[in-house]
């Protein structure tokens, strides 16, 4: 009997302990229920079975679009009356993007066909209709879809159940719309939804239990992935259903039994709205004419709630997004370099004086050597001579060669020389060692009959060298003529041969100009003529080139920090304009970004480049993602975009 009483007491204490431990949670749940929102109205649906909704305006009327596991997509009016349905397919996720007036682009994942499908939602004589545009098979179910507008293009982000994301440009062709792949994105499992804020250019991804991520939507920028909202901010384990109210600047989402809203520009302020819903765990929530609408998973009921919603943030009214820089489409590209990672660096252009269309592009692979390309971007020749960084060339008078190219070599510190024949053959003339720890930047120029080169050490000093031809074809030497001390790292440089002026870029400082003759005479020092300001020039200042065309001559500079290219007057004293190199869908070319080196020529290279050619290193080679390469841009397109004519 005593033993039985002992067990009874032990069980009683254990249960009491459990109840005591659960007490705070039960108390919190009771408080939550007492404050939970009750629906003011219920919108009944007919055999929809939906887990996502979104509001839209069409033909002057207000509608809700719903994903349907039974009927694909269903459109209902403000009262819940059904207006159209696909009546086929199993859809849990869709993305919605406004196009022209009364036109919406819809991307949906159909589980029955395992396809990403594009449709156009519009009206025909005032009656809503939905039309098929295109479909693309997928290898895994898609769990998150969201659209982005970039440079008047429509981009689609699609993330599958394993966390592998893809960015596409979706665009019309003659017969149907196309999905053009831009890049992959990697998140890991349990992604639940995504949204894009086009004003800030941020892609937002919900990934329970890690939180909500924010990263750059533009593939030509670093991801800069950071936490938009941590799990503690969300107060729930199962969160998602991201929906952006662009008018107010609030990001709405669901978490367990709650609906939350965050200021898109100030997530650190915490949730601007957080309310539990009575007897409901929503998976999709939106605002609609001052009301909150919510939907449970696989539901046939939309709940309406009368509740005070957060007002548009004051800063949202003034926010206009990042400075828009004009864009010029890429005209061509070279094949990717063989080395992975940060490899391609600096180009030079050899103009064939007899047949300009047979000119060459020399490009460094700073992990292996020098690549030679034709103007179609095909690889003509490779020289595996070491880690070449910067390359430049000039024409010469010589018995065999019509031009000499020089490149800094960081494997065995020195300068590698190359000769170019009149027929376009490139020969390696060997390495000339330098008393320099790490040769980095380089630019070649002519001083009368002499061939000169400036070479920078990564630690800061810049040497002036003369390239002296010898008796034989490869018997060349370097003679040091002067030393220029600079305070920080210099890579990009170019010389105006006619004016005998050196321009060089201090990566985080700006553009400097030096009168070479006066410097050699001891009467001049470099002048800072264009400091880094974050807009016209954003650090790092990298590649430089001179476009020579009389009074239409320009200094062209790579502004790496904002992925743009700045034009200055020939003397560098005045800013003329800037541009980005953009996607060319007609040629299936991506743009360029994170550019190190560049070169430009005003020669006419034929119908594709009648006013000259700009070649830039592309640090992020997309469409599809590959190793780095060089992009080619027609100067005629640059001149038209910046009104240089």
Which ranges hold each PLM region?
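Sequence/structural signature of beta-propeller domains
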Residues: 23-645
